[in-house]
Amino acid sequence: MPKMKTKKSAAKRFVVRPGGTVKRGQAFKRHILTKKTTKNKRHLRGSTAVHDADMNSVRAMLPFA
């Protein structure tokens, strides 16, 4: 059986909190910002939690987290 390895792209994008939830950054905040309203950009600040439907995929990508 091959070694389990962490997906490095996922390790750079996600942070596992002590309670077991996974933190991720918001999308749609990199470019093409002129057509987005200030309110929309403000709501995209900060981070949020990964949804329950995606947790199995994230856990598989981060086996040691």
Curated annotation (Swiss-Prot):
Any one annotated GO CC term: cytosolic large ribosomal subunit
One BP term from GO: translation
Molecular function in Gene Ontology: structural constituent of ribosome
Stated name of the protein: Large ribosomal subunit protein bL35
Membership in a protein family: Belongs to the bacterial ribosomal protein bL35 family.
Keywords tagged on the record: Ribonucleoprotein, Ribosomal protein
NCBIfam families noted in UniProt: rpmI_bact (TIGR00001)
Pfam family, one: Ribosomal_L35p
InterPro entries reported in the protein's UniProt record: Ribosomal_bL35, Ribosomal_bL35-like, Ribosomal_bL35_CS, Ribosomal_bL35_sf
